[in-house]
């Protein structure tokens, strides 16, 4: 199929996992065509449980693009284009803070492959739409939940605003993305490198009021997926701006993840949760692995870069084992087991989750490859 080799210690195992991932995704899109799942229920993608918010449609298409680019197979390319077109109307969706998650894995990859300016315009429009969520008084992009709220997750979406600012060019878009990152750095990243999920602001004055959480154990605890979003997202902010503050914050968040997580690299849903019933949040680990590979390429300290790269490899070796990979679990439709969507709402707990699938595939694809702008 023309697959690129993976010049890393993971080597053959990584290729086998990508082959398995392709088989699972092929089953998903042929069994449930034009369906965008968020998480499995009992290992099955199709169910009628709550979504909470629709933010995952780009991850399925993103995997299709990775498979198309890795294999050169027109079957994957046709489906990647199809699933990307299905979400195009959301380029003007002002109800969510997740347009980066939707359009960066899909339409941005499509543009990178073709250079077609019509495709690029969709990415730019999504970035401009996301920037409309900016609160000038508080200097933050508001979450989907409320006007006085921002989430650490949004750090993963600011890249599409930076990109739009760069391509147009538009200095106001650059200001918006930069100020949001600085606000998040100041109020959601703590002195020890841990992160809060949510920040609450006074709508009249813009003053920061308090840290909060929707998916962690407590307002002052450390939700693992949010930590992974931060180490990845601040790395991306540094990649676009060259602002050393963002690199330092990404490294601080990465160091906290590594220091607090067991040697195998997979954190629980929240490090402060006492005696968790589910000890693993595999999607946070997959995000962290991909973010650490990016960070290893960004840092100019060789020892630190090697540390991040080796830890990312440790995570991936763990996730590629039968404990986490569904390869030896008959009837399980996902790729990666033991993910958690929303523990408080009991949604997608100890299941496969679509972002966990995507970031595992992205991390494996990233091995040995330079970071992509």
Describe each region flagged by the PLM.
Residues 1-373:
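Glycan-recognition and catalytic cores of secretory/periplasmic carbohydrate-active enzymes
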